Amino acid sequence: MNTSNQHKAGHVTTRKLLDMKQQGEKISVLTAYDYTMARILDRAGIDVILVGDSASNVFSGHATTLPITIEEMIYHAKAVVRGVHDESGRAMVVVDMPFMSYQISGDEALRNAGKIMKEHGCDALKLEGGKIIADTVKRITDVGIPVMGHLGLMPQSIYKYGSYKVRAQEEQEAEQLLQDARLLEEAGAFAVVLEKIPSALAAEVTLMLTIPTIGIGAGSHCDGQVLVVNDILGLNREFHPRFVRQYANLNNVIDRAVQQYVDDVKQGGFPADDESY
């Protein structure tokens, strides 16, 4: 395993994230899927980079996260780990275990977790689910692999839900989420993502757990926040969910740049003499 990025001074660890929660310092998380973006995020001071199975959507154009494979996740993870290592090496890198790589059996989950960790040298893995995967989380953490949980809206279960609406609005589902959060912490998870749940419920979970909560569409009371980097940069002009704050409009910037390049090439304005050998 390539662990050279983990040995750089100031590298964010699971212990560091726990300290941040205890000290009231918010945790910043963004997704990345390639070397260049990983370098930019690490240089900008992001705490955690999530190599999300959302690559299935934003990188490969699938409608859901379900089609992405272990091999594809390893490909993206290797690129991100190299990017962090070649920059400051500060950011923690967490990788999603893709759909059906951990749900079939505990033994298969353990083999796949080991395969993902060994092939790219990331810091931790993320799994979706509560009670149903708690034993799997324990088995993985027991062999020394850190696990981040994920509750609320779980994109790998989208066909079960039928929509991407807010979860745990009813009392029964909210109580189950609270129980699942406790079980994940007891199983050894070092943090848990809370996706698209009521802000008040996220605040309750955050207060209840000793491990950090990372929100996405879960209000401001979580210990940290995660978003898809393509969304905050405005790269997808059709996607504007309520929980995303767009910090740039790179879709328009790129569009104008490409149009200018096309015009320059067509009109013979590129390359100029000082751009030639």
Curated annotation (Swiss-Prot):
It holds the Pfam family Pantoate_transf. 3-methyl-2-oxobutanoate binds at residues 53-54, 96, 126. Pathway: Cofactor biosynthesis; (R)-pantothenate biosynthesis; (R)-pantoate from 3-methyl-2-oxobutanoate: step 1/2. Binds 1 Mg(2+) ion per subunit. This is 3-methyl-2-oxobutanoate hydroxymethyltransferase. It catalyses: 3-methyl-2-oxobutanoate + (6R)-5,10-methylene-5,6,7,8-tetrahydrofolate + H2O = 2-dehydropantoate + (6S)-5,6,7,8-tetrahydrofolate. It is found in: Cytoplasm. InterPro entries: Pantoate_hydroxy_MeTrfase (IPR003700), Pyrv/PenolPyrv_kinase-like_dom (IPR015813), Pyrv_kinase-like_dom_sf (IPR040442). The gene is panB. Catalyzes the reversible reaction in which hydroxymethyl group from 5,10-methylenetetrahydrofolate is transferred onto alpha-ketoisovalerate to form ketopantoate. Mg(2+) binds at residues 53, 96, 128. Coiled coil: none annotated. SUPFAM superfamilies: Phosphoenolpyruvate/pyruvate domain. GO terms for biological process: pantothenate biosynthetic process. One of its GO terms (cellular component) is cytoplasm. Keywords: Cytoplasm, Magnesium, Metal-binding, Pantothenate biosynthesis, Transferase. GO terms for molecular function: 3-methyl-2-oxobutanoate hydroxymethyltransferase activity; magnesium ion binding. Its cofactor is Mg(2+). Homodecamer; pentamer of dimers. The active site is at residue 195. Belongs to the PanB family. It is an enzyme of class 2 (transferase).
